[in-house]
Swiss-Prot record:
GO biological process, one term: oligodendrocyte development
Keyword Protein biosynthesis carried by entry: yes
Similarity comment text for this entry: Belongs to the eIF-2B alpha/beta/delta subunits family.
Keywords associated with the record: Acetylation, Cytoplasm, Initiation factor, Protein biosynthesis
Single GO molecular function: identical protein binding
Quaternary structure annotation from Swiss-Prot or TrEMBL: Component of the translation initiation factor 2B (eIF2B) complex which is a heterodecamer of two sets of five different subunits: alpha, beta, gamma, delta and epsilon. Subunits alpha, beta and delta comprise a regulatory subcomplex and subunits epsilon and gamma comprise a catalytic subcomplex. Within the complex, the hexameric regulatory complex resides at the center, with the two heterodimeric catalytic subcomplexes bound on opposite sides.
Chief subcellular location: cytoplasm
Domain of life: Eukaryota
Protein name: Translation initiation factor eIF2B subunit alpha
InterPro entries: eIF2B_alpha/beta/delta (IPR051501), elF-2B_alpha_N (IPR042528), IF-2B-related (IPR000649), IF_2B-like_C (IPR042529), NagB/RpiA_transferase-like (IPR037171)
Name of the gene: Eif2b1
Known regulation of activity: Activated by the chemical integrated stress response (ISR) inhibitor ISRIB which stimulates guanine nucleotide exchange factor activity for both phosphorylated and unphosphorylated eIF2.
Function: Acts as a component of the translation initiation factor 2B (eIF2B) complex, which catalyzes the exchange of GDP for GTP on eukaryotic initiation factor 2 (eIF2) gamma subunit. Its guanine nucleotide exchange factor activity is repressed when bound to eIF2 complex phosphorylated on the alpha subunit, thereby limiting the amount of methionyl-initiator methionine tRNA available to the ribosome and consequently global translation is repressed.
SUPFAM superfamilies, per database record: NagB/RpiA/CoA transferase-like
Length: 305
């Protein structure tokens, strides 16, 4: 697959299913790339896949696309040393790739089954931006006949919170959109906070839409539980200690980073994500189970080794 064909396939996957996470679309694209690859050696195939991941990250610079691609490559490569015949090995790699895709497609349902039990009848939930996993959790709570209401931040600069509010109104869930600046004001009315994550880092912290960190700080100050829901393919080998440690390639949109190469200054741009430290997080709900932030490093090691 040429670069243009790869990018077009990735974009078509995203357009075909709006509920699909960008990381899942990237993994589907990589699987298709693997099937079409004309390479004749394992080393060449691995190099081609690595380049394909880099190309996709240039289209969508989210943490999840990077970590999902790396985990996909790691998972399919585990059997590469067991077979001397290249065609046999490639066939096994494709089978493992399809297995990996099936596993991650079940992630949201597993998380929803774990997390919705923490939502009590009459709960007032605060959430941030648009998260497909959070939406799936709330759908499960609605299916369980629980009555609850949701406060959601509008989430500048793309107003993705309004998109989330619209999705919740279709479920007949009482929802109130609040200003990003009103998080401290509204926190005293909330019983718990549930947010998604673009990436879960090695120390148990998260990288998510800008504004998540201030919400976690407010929740901690007012002793409200702060829950994170995220699929395991978002676990990334990164160890930030503060906002400056988050790489620019994750902080900014791919288009913004390209414009910087033409001379534009990044200081004039607003970051799209921020880092929330593990000390502010109560629990993480993943398809691997319910984890404390301190348990994330153990699970991450299992995934990457």
């Amino acid at each position: 697959m040429e670069d243009g064909e790869l990018i077009e396939y990735f974009k078509s996957q995203m357009k075909g299913d709006p509920k699909m996470a960008s990381a899942v679309a990237a993994i589907q694209t990589l699987l298709e790339f693997l099937k079409r690859d004309k390479g004749e050696t394992l080393q060449g195939l691995r190099a081609n896949l690595t380049y394909a991941i880099k190309t996709l990250c240039g289209v969508d610079s989210s943490v999840a696309v990077s970590s999902g691609g790396e985990l996909f490559l790691r998972f399919i490569s585990l059997t590469s040393l067991e077979y001397s015949d290249y065609s046999k090995c490639k066939k096994i790699m494709i089978e493992r790739g399809e297995l990996f895709l099936r596993r991650i497609s079940l992630s949201r349902n597993k998380i929803a089954n774990l997390c919705h039990t923490f939502i009590k009848d009459g709960a007032r939930i605060l959430t941030h931006a648009y998260s497909r996993v959070v939406l799936r959790v709330l759908e499960e709570a609605v299916a369980a006949k629980k009555r609850f209401s949701v406060y959601i931040t509008e989430s500048q600069p793309d107003l993705s919170g309004k998109k989330m509010a619209k999705a919740l109104s279709h479920l007949n869930v009482p929802v109130t959109v609040v200003l990003d600046a009103a998080v401290g004001y509204i926190m005293e009315k909330a019983d718990l906070v549930i947010v998604g994550a673009e990436g879960v880092v090695e120390n148990g912290g998260i990288i998510n839409k800008i504004g998540t960190n201030q919400m976690a700080v407010c929740a901690k100050a007012q002793n409200k539980p702060f829950y994170v829901v995220a699929e395991s393919f978002k676990f990334v080998r990164l160890f930030p200690l503060n906002q400056e440690d988050v790489p620019d390639k994750f902080k900014y949109k791919a288009d913004t980073l390209k414009s910087v190469q033409t001379g534009q200054d990044l200081k004039e741009e607003h970051p799209w994500v921020d880092y929330t430290s593990p000390s502010l997080i109560t629990l993480l709900f993943t398809d691997l189970g319910v984890l404390t932030p301190s348990a994330v490093s153990d699970e991450l090691i299992k995934l990457y080794l």
